[in-house]
């Protein structure tokens, strides 16, 4: 049975200097992958700049339609947001309408990430860790730790489309309840909420209505911006509403679904953080004053005021900020504060701080890494081996011992015992803490625990009867956080789950160190497998052996998708893993769990860049056992875009997957990188045929890849 239409975008960076990068649109239908012809905007802006992140916005539960020029209340058009390595963010409105009608996909609005990052060189590239939208705030988080926040003028039902489509279990992700959010909001946040409510649509009240354009004099004086502003054909370039700077090396970023002023970050050698933006009254007062001033001056007049300093001078003030400061002279504390000085210095961008409200406890848990180094046999072997060499028993500097230990740590070290010569307990524990900090997270998802679950969720006490007076609980993590779980995967094939409301350590952790080698008690495992064979026959034994082999081949987790609050869909370079985390009874030996708890599909994906998951069908039985059918869209370092169809069956540890279609780049100076899901019709979508001219396909230069 053919699947519904899947439409997605793929970024195509170019590694040749002086040539443009960009992105392409593809459609998968009737088991065929085809290029969607589209006309892009000016390609000069893509020279020496590539797309780092997509963010596709559309109303939730409503059909999209083109926005008319006349004034109307509700916005129904969709927006594609493209964040580029040169620090510019393009917003394309009426995106699907333009695709269907063959219109140019030129940006309608331009954002600029400023202050610029000049730490590495003058024309520094922006490495983006995350581009996300939630409840009117667009976050752009750089790997350098710089976070730019833009206040968008959108209705409350607008959401960001994720790279997963799963209509079967929509209740495992937090819904936005504005009443609950304002209950625990500060006075500054309530004032911010009242000042930035959706205004309706007109020719002037667009998506960037709350943003301040960069002054033309600043555009001319900035060498980075001035080289691009002419290419955007006179479009206003808007500056961020807020800016903050955290530690460097951010690898993953997500907005807290319970609080739009709160976000979560992960970086190598650092734990998982939940941070809260500190919103000062000075900045909120400035923003609300500017918006009210804009309402009175601009009104419903078409066109954007490009220079507010010129308007201020026409009204007898030296600049916009002297005009605004004149409106709240009754409060001299605002004008005399350092926050106001920063607002003036950075031309209307608030330089804000953030506070850590929760932090993962890292480096002290007695997990499999701890047990690996603290077994008596290993320590005894170390003492015996030290007697064969007088040099090994001589005192040596601590730094040398640690250096040699780290150099000896290879992938084979996880499969055999290691020699730690003459290490005392505190030295060994210090080494283990350093090792564990290197097993950093590569991806994490936030889900809401469904209360009717009966499985093992990692919490012994009832959530409703927990003593709220516990001094160890963070006051910020209110009752709304009782059902929040953060599920994580790290580079060394480990799955962890946190419940920040109660713990700073994982409530469940599946470590590959013991499972790759089978179990700590090999004899018991063989006896157990033999008993299973006697009961169920030889077929089950073969499946168990194949399952063990496939599990041992896993080497690097890449992507995590939560199908519901328990089902973890993990993509590894050597297969697909489906874990029902609430049903796991034995984390030390995965074979001792039921067949439907942990399932795997062996497949060699190669070096994965990005993935889209489409869940076609889920059949859940009364015992919470499910059969699953899905489609995968994968981009790889080999320059391929691959679409595969996979299945997981009931009462079977092994699934199967097959190649549907694949396209590969012929050009050696380009590769395929980021993906963005745009549309999916579903299995009962109306069938229609799209014809493409060969001249449209020539612009991408692709070839079919045939496989057995």
Curated annotation (Swiss-Prot):
Residue ranges of the region described as Disordered: 381-403
GO biological process per UniProt: actin cortical patch assembly; regulation of protein-containing complex assembly
Changes seen on gene knockout: Causes a decrease in the number of actin patches and concomitant accumulation of upstream components like coat patches.
Residue ranges, compositional bias (Low complexity): 381-396
Domain of life: Eukaryota
Quaternary assembly: Interacts with core components of the GID/CTLH ubiquitin ligase complex. GID12 binds both the substrate receptor GID4 and the tip of GID5 in the scaffolding module, sealing GID4 onto the scaffold.
Described purpose of this protein according to its UniProt entry: Regulator of the GID E3 ligase complex. Modulates both assembly of the substrate receptor GID4 into the GID E3 ligase complex and its activity toward its substrates. GID12-binding remodels the N-degron binding pocket in the GID(SR4) complex, and could limit substrate accessibility of a bulky substrate to a ubiquitynation active site, thereby stabilizing gluconeogenic enzyme substrates. Involved in actin patch formation.
Miscellaneous field: Present with 339 molecules/cell in log phase SD medium.
Protein name: GID complex associated protein 12
Organism listed in the record: Saccharomyces cerevisiae (strain ATCC 204508 / S288c) (Baker's yeast)
Gene expressing this chain: GID12
């Amino acid at each position: 049975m053919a699947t519904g239409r899947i439409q997605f975008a793929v970024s195509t960076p170019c590694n040749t200097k002086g040539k443009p990068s960009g992105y392409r649109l593809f459609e998968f239908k009737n088991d065929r992958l085809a290029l969607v012809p589209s006309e892009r905007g000016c390609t000069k802006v893509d020279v020496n700049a590539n797309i780092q992140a997509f963010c596709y916005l559309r109303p939730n539960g409503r059909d999209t339609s083109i926005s008319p020029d006349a004034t109307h209340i509700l916005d129904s058009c969709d927006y594609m947001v493209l964040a580029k390595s040169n620090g510019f963010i393009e917003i394309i409105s009426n995106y699907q309408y333009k695709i269907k009608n063959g219109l140019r996909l030129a940006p309608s609005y331009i954002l600029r990430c400023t202050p610029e990052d000049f730490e590495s060189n003058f024309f520094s590239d922006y490495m983006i860790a995350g581009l996300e939208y939630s409840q009117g705030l667009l976050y752009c988080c750089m790997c350098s730790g710089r976070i730019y926040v833009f206040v968008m003028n959108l209705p409350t039902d607008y959401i960001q489309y994720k790279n997963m489509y799963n209509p079967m279990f929509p209740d495992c992700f937090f819904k936005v309840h504005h009443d609950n959010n304002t209950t625990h909001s500060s006075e500054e946040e309530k004032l911010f909420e009242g000042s930035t409510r959706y205004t309706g649509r007109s020719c002037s009240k667009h998506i960037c209505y709350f943003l301040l354009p960069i002054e033309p004099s600043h555009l001319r004086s900035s060498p980075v911006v001035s080289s691009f502003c002419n290419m955007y054909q006179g479009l206003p370039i808007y500056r961020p509403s807020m800016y903050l700077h955290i530690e460097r090396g951010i690898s993953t970023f997500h907005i807290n679904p319970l609080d739009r002023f709160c976000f979560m970050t992960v970086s190598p050698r650092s734990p998982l953080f939940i941070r809260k933006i500190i919103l000062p009254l000075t900045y909120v007062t400035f923003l609300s004053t500017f918006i009210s001033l804009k309402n009175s001056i601009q009104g419903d007049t078409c066109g954007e005021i490009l220079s507010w300093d010129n308007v201020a001078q026409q009204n007898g003030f030296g600049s916009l900020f002297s005009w605004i400061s004149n409106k709240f002279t009754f409060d001299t504390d605002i004008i005399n504060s350092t926050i106001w000085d920063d607002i003036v210095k950075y031309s209307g961008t608030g330089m804000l701080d953030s506070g850590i409200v929760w932090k993962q406890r890292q480096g002290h848990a007695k997990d499999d890494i701890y047990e690996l180094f603290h077994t008596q046999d290993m320590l005894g072997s170390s003492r015996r081996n030290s007697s064969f060499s007088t040099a090994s028993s001589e005192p040596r500097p601590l730094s040398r011992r640690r250096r040699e230990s780290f150099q000896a740590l290879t992938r084979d070290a996880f499969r055999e015992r290691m020699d730690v010569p003459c290490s005392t307990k505190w030295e060994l524990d210090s080494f283990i803490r350093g090792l564990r900090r290197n097993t950093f997270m590569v991806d994490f998802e936030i889900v809401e625990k469904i209360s009717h679950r009966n499985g093992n969720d990692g919490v012994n006490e009832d959530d409703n009867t927990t003593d709220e007076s516990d001094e160890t609980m963070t006051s910020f993590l209110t009752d709304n956080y009782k059902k929040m779980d953060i599920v994580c995967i790290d580079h060394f094939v480990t799955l962890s789950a946190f419940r920040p409301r109660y713990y700073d350590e994982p409530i469940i952790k599946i470590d590959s160190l013991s499972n790759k080698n089978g179990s700590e008690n090999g004899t018991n495992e063989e006896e157990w497998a033999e008993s299973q064979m006697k009961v169920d026959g030889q077929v089950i034994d073969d499946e168990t052996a194949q399952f063990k082999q496939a599990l041992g081949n896993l080497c690097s987790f890449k992507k995590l998708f939560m199908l519901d609050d328990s089902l973890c869909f993990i993509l590894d370079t050597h297969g697909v893993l489906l874990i029902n985390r609430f049903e796991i009874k034995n984390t030390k030996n995965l074979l001792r769990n039921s067949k439907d708890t942990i399932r795997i599909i062996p497949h060699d994906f190669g070096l994965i860049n990005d993935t889209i998951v489409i869940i076609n069908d889920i059949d859940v039985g009364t015992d919470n056992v499910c059969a699953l059918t899905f489609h995968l869209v994968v981009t790889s370092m080999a320059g391929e875009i691959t679409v595969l169809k996979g299945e997981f069956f009931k009462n079977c540890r092994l699934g199967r997957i097959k190649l549907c279609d694949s396209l590969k780049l012929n050009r050696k100076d380009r590769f395929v990188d980021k993906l963005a899901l745009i549309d999916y019709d579903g299995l009962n979508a109306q069938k229609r045929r799209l014809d493409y001219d060969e001249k449209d396909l020539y612009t991408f230069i692709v070839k079919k890849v045939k496989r057995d």
